[in-house]
């Protein structure tokens, strides 16, 4: 199977499986090899690493991750993409695809099973409609994470870096800056995706620095300028609330 990081190979796979994009899942697949390589390089992946990929799509970035890491766990919510992933990733024996909602996946259990409980690295082209719950959940849950390298809406990436007292400072800014050192590693125009999103994107990297999930974070929140309102009213740029996932809680009954 050829690498998918270009329009030609991506279109061939989509046509082969007669795949239709679903807007409800915020699907925009990367088709630029340069951006893919920048993301992989920024993640600092080694052959000792376990990678959690959220939303692998057709496996474009997953292929690159499999080439670089010891183990890749790819969590995909869209059932229609599973047979495609089985095809595009068939040459790799170091990848496991899980068909589930990432907010309901027990990441601690995965880290324990596939990485002996050691910290993992998260790499993802995140669906923009659910960016905040995923990021907040990753940082605020007791998930063993070494670093995150993710693609997000540019406006959201910019918000992660603003300081207290600015109008865009909110719960996401506070959490990211408390738990990691945020850095934008690439600004990505819409033409690097298929289909093209209506907004610009940025690849964001952050090495996790804080490990105290309790009193220290509460104290930091209370002392931050404007934190009381920030924690209760996150910006709605990505179209979601600031509720984070539990990453291991029981699924709600149907």
Residue spans for each PLM region:
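Extended, hydrophobic beta-loop-alpha segments that form or line the acyl/peptidyl-thioester binding
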Residues: 220, 232-235
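Catalytic cores of RNA-modifying enzymes
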Residues: 1-222, 228, 245-253
């Amino acid at each position: 199977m050829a690498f998918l990081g270009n329009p030609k190979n991506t279109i061939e796979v989509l046509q082969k499986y007669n795949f239709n994009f679903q807007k409800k899942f915020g699907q925009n697949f990367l088709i630029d090899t340069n951006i893919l390589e920048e993301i992989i390089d920024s993640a600092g992946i080694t052959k000792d690493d376990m990678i959690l990929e959220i939303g692998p799509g057709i496996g474009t970035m997953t292929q690159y991750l499999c080439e670089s890491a010891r183990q890749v766990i790819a969590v995909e919510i869209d059932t229609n993409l599973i047979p495609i992933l089985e095809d595009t990733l068939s040459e790799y024996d170091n990848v496991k695809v899980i068909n589930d909602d990432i907010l309901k996946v027990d990441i601690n259990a995965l880290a324990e099973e596939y990485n002996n409980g050691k910290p993992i690295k998260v790499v993802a082209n995140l669906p923009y409609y659910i960016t905040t719950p995923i990021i907040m959940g990753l940082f605020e849950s007791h998930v063993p994470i070494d670093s995150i390298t993710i693609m997000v809406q540019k406006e959201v990436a910019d918000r992660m870096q603003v300081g207290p007292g600015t109008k865009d400072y909110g719960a996401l800014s506070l959490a990211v800056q408390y738990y990691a050192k945020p850095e934008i590693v690439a600004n990505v125009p819409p033409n690097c995706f298929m289909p093209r999103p209506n907004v610009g994107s940025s690849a964001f990297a952050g090495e996790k620095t804080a490990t105290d999930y309790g009193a220290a974070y509460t104290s930091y929140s209370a002392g931050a300028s404007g934190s009381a309102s920030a924690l209760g009213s996150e910006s709605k740029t990505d179209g979601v609330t600031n509720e984070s996932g539990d990453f291991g809680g029981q699924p709600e009954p149907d």
